Amino acid sequence: MAKVRVYELAKEFGVESKVVMAKLQELGEFVRSASSTIEAPVVRKLTDALQQGNGGKAAPRKAAPAKPGAPSPAQAARPAAPRPPAPKPAAAERPAAAERPAAAPAAPGPRPGPKPAPRPAPAAPAPAAPEFTAPPSAPAAPAAAASGPRPGARPGAPKPGGARPATPGQGQGGQVRGERTDRGDRGDRGDRQGAARPGGQAPRPGARPAGPRPGNNPFTSGGSTGMARPQAPRPGGAPRPGGAGAPGGPRPQGAGGQDRAPRPQGGPGGAPRPQGGPGGARPTPGGMPRPQAPRPGGAPGGNRPNPGMMPQRPAAGPRPGGGGPGGRGPGGGGRPGGPGGGGGRPGGGGFAGRPGGGGGGFAGRPGGPGGGGGGFAGRPGGPGGGGGGRPGFGGRPGGPGGRGGTQGAFGRPGGPARRGRKSKRQRRQEYEAMQAPSVGGVMLPRGNGQSVRLSRGASLTDFAEKIGANPASLVGVMMNLGEMVTATQSVSDETLKLLADEMNFVLEIVSPEEEDRELLESFDIEFGEDEGGEEFLVARPPVVTVMGHVDHGKTRLLDTIRKTNVVAGEAGGITQHIGAYQVTTEVNDEERKITFIDTPGHEAFTAMRARGAKSTDIAILVVAANDGVMPQTIEALNHAKAADVPIVVAVNKIDVEGADPTKVRGQLTEFGLVAEEYGGDTMFVDISAKQGLNIESLLEAVVLTADASLDLRANPEQDAQGIAIESHLDRGRGAVATVLVQRGTLRVGDTMVVGDAYGRVRAMLDDKGENVEEAGPSTPVLVLGLTNVPGAGDNFLVVDEDRTARQIAEKRAARERNANFARRGVRFSLENLDEALKAGLVQELNLIIKGDASGSVEALESSLLQLDVGEEVDIRILHRGVGAVTESDINLATGSDAIVIGFNVRAAGRAAQMAEREGVDVRYYSVIYQAIEEIEAALKGMLKPEYEEVELGTAEIREVFKSSKLGNIAGVLVRSGEVKRNTKARLIRDGKVIAESLNISGLRRFKDDVTEIREGFEGGINLGNFNDIKVDDVIATYEMREKPRS
């Protein structure tokens, strides 16, 4: 047999699809919809169930009431079925057959309402053994019981007295059970006939109903325990699922159609509830009589109450019996039923069952776990109850959920979970979560103003570890803030501070000096302190830095002191490197060594001057007597003050015409340098570096200042420490660094670390180019043997092992790399980056800088990055290095369209040929300001042109001529300037602009087409399709001209 669909079976049986679906659910077969298919065995089981439920034929639910007759063969055979004689205790727990569902016990107690009349005797004689009436709150049995016992079901305990025979014609008021007359007016059930069933006090150890096991079916149509739910009455007398006479089907009408009185509770006049086919008595396992507890207020006979008779709940008195402890229990005094819910009337409710029973019955309280929806005027069913209250009888809506839930399944208790008291930790976490800030829907930890220390170039992961947050959350926050970064990418300090402010943290960026100190402390190294006591300290020469404005004679002064000519070797006559020299002079018939450091005076070398002031003991400020105080003079003065070093002023060029040393003294007084002759403490010396005048006086002033205000001592026996003044890449010697030893003694063979470079000292040269084996404090030397070119201004120190030197250098390199990446950063927000690049609004000039010394490269890079020609163009330094231009530089420039700048270096080997072949622009410079000027011009050339409006002339309309071909033509008189053809114009009327961006398409003078009309002449102007012109209007013409970018 092929599979059939549910709706096809419903059409075949003449019932609705939902009736068939409900029957299938009661049989334990679950389908999703009316279009679902079912197997052939299920079809046969469904057919048998519907035939048994409809008196042996598959008829529609709304069939006429069947006449009393014999029960179906299956039903008639069931009471006579043999049962095992020995009752077992487990029989009360195992389902033997699906004779009946869970029932609610009845308890003694009065039932409110009119007393029912005694019922007539049943048509068929009762067996000799005493029988008991079905509990009034028992729900309809599952349809699976109609088809006989389920295979494998255990037999129940035998009942004494045998089975009750099926009594044809046994009904209520002569009507067969299975047909309901009217929804609103139910028949009187007090006239049901049958022998009085004595009630027992103890619960019957009966079998658990067969059918779907409780808890195994989360989609059952009954309560949430998995039991079949008794169907509540439907409005308008709609048939119930299962057909006429099916369990839980329509109720028969009372005698005479009168209103129901309250149902009897355990009185002798109670009749057994029919089960199965029409008129059939409910069979019991083994024919045993069911013990029944006394009903409350057990008056014999009577009508069952209806909503009209009981408009409100009784104010006092004991409640009718609630549900039994799961399944069909004895009638009790309102004791709560088990999770399975007490049986009962519509909605699974008992008669006013207490919590734990089904949903509300007659004015019932709320159903407990697994209970159904409210019934007649019932309160809401418990959570998870199926169906809810039915309309039409005042039933309140049932609990949440339409289909059954899983409460009570697998031994779990039903109903809402009880919420225990929260611990202090839970309450604290909830409180903190309430206060946690949210940025773009991302929850973040909230600080209370505590400080978070991060190094330069820190990533979001580093920040997240400090505050105990998730790095992915911080990435989401940055996306919401318009920054596209990853969790491990270095982020700028400003971005991290903004993020910290959002979460109420105070971010502290660790300075480079602090970072380096912490790094050295991790290796148990102290930098900047003299080891040993006072007995180990010896005098050292002073370190003097010569500072001042460009071209004021600093290098000439040093040449005079050293009796050399360094100026001749400097490109452009300006110093572009830091030079360190040591000279010996006689002061008061005593030889004294003085170390001089020459710093550049050009504005691009600010970092070099700061570095020179930081490593010096005394500063000589050179000021030209003819120029006076200049910008770089003030800057050098500020550097010296910041370094807290004493200053000796050398007023140079006193032999030049126009020199005025007094004027220089007066100008420097404004900056806090008061000469000794004016009552101050600053020594001023008038010199001429070119003529060699007063040089000895200057050296004497330096020595006196050092002796008077400085304690120049150091320990020469400790490991050397100092500063790298300059570094460069030599073709024959590799990386070379000029270092100034400040403490200790540097020897050949020592392992040293200079910034991110390290290595063993292979050789040392002094300022005269001679090899030396060791260098003491305040001695400048040239060091060979480093792995790479260190940065100018980096500290150096000697360590014991090569491994320690390598680890320190690698960590410094990683730190500097992160800092550079963060400094470069993301210059555009996430929202406008793509649009700006597509529209060409942002352009970048990529540069590769190579130089002869690290200080020069640093100065050039900083100067180029300070160029500001607008927001449309930006400079990006792809690479910088010391040494000649190599092939790798050309390859990098080829892939990135970069310009290579060689500062005092040339392309090496085949690099020049490759650059010419690839079309890479390589520019060579020897003077720094020339490079800056050319790059600035290139940046301005990349700018998009700016246009400005230039007015050409105005014309007044004297007459308007109409032309069928051209429209309106204005006869004008040019008042000022000139009017040209194909230029833009605007129309002005009474001082207000009427139209913009008009085009002068036609221009005539008399009958001739002309290109322009000058001031004072008349002509005709055609404005194209624009015809709204009047006399006395003014036509102003203009054009857009490119504006030079400055």
UniProtKB/Swiss-Prot annotation:
Q: Name one GO molecular function term.
A: GTPase activity
Residues annotated as region Disordered?
49-450
Q: Which residues form the tr-type G domain?
A: 539-711
Region span, G3: 598-601
Q: Where are the stretches annotated G1?
A: 548-555
Domain of life from the UniProt record: Bacteria
Tell me which residues bind GTP: 548-555, 598-602, 652-655
Please provide one cellular component term from the Gene Ontology annotations of this protein.
Answer: cytosol
Q: Where is this region: G5?
A: 688-690
NCBIfam families on file:
IF-2, small_GTP
Function, as annotated, reads:
One of the essential components for the initiation of protein synthesis. Protects formylmethionyl-tRNA from spontaneous hydrolysis and promotes its binding to the 30S ribosomal subunits. Also involved in the hydrolysis of GTP during the formation of the 70S ribosomal complex.
Homology family: Belongs to the TRAFAC class translation factor GTPase superfamily. Classic translation factor GTPase family. IF-2 subfamily.
Q: What is this protein called?
A: Translation initiation factor IF-2
Q: From which source organism is this entry?
A: Streptomyces avermitilis (strain ATCC 31267 / DSM 46492 / JCM 5070 / NBRC 14893 / NCIMB 12804 / NRRL 8165 / MA-4680)
